[in-house]
Amino acid sequence: MEDVAGRLPGHGLYVLPTMDRIGRLLKKNGDTANLDGVVQRCGIALSRRFLDGLGLAKRAGVVRRGLREAEALLQAGHKPLLILAANIATHSRQKFEGVVHRYAVDEWVELLDSVRLGAACGWSESVVLAVNDPGLERRLRVDAFRWQTFHRKVDA
């Protein structure tokens, strides 16, 4: 069973799922036939959890869309979570990096594509989003970290 929220009862240990760890576990148990299905289910569940959190933030009214609105939050002294679509254009990435450098933002998340990020908020494509609520920001950071960890290739 996939526990993407990290809430199942246990002994206080939560192992971050990665494709490699899941593969090793299934090979160890002799169940390699299910590998693709389990990996796909985990990837979908992690994406869905992040996008659900983003939709929740939108309904709470704490999501800003676009580089200008994100920069306005930074200029006002806020420290929002900046979310960048993985399919951002080179020119837009350069603008984003300029803003990040100007306001000394040391951390942002880059994942999924602009269509999925926008759809989670009920918009068309959205390349840059800013979430300005500490609680939702924390949840989205954790979910983004789990998503990125899952999709990272690990050699061991």
Each model region followed by its residue ranges:
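N-terminal targeting/trafficking signals and adjacent low-complexity tails
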Residues: 102, 152-156
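Positively charged, polar, low-complexity stretches
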Residues: 6, 23, 40, 67-71, ...
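Short basic, glycine-rich beta-strand/loop surfaces that mediate nucleic-acid
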Residues: 2, 8-9, 103-148
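Structural motif
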Residues: 85-87, 132-133
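N-terminal cysteine/histidine-rich coordination modules
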Residues: 1-31
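Short glycine-/acidic-enriched loop or helix-start segments at secondary-structure transitions
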Residues: 25-26, 93-94, 140
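Extended interfacial segments that mediate partner engagement and assembly in macromolecular machines
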Residues: 20-84, 90
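Short, glycine/charged-enriched secondary-structure capping and boundary segments
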Residues: 29-30, 96-99, 123-124
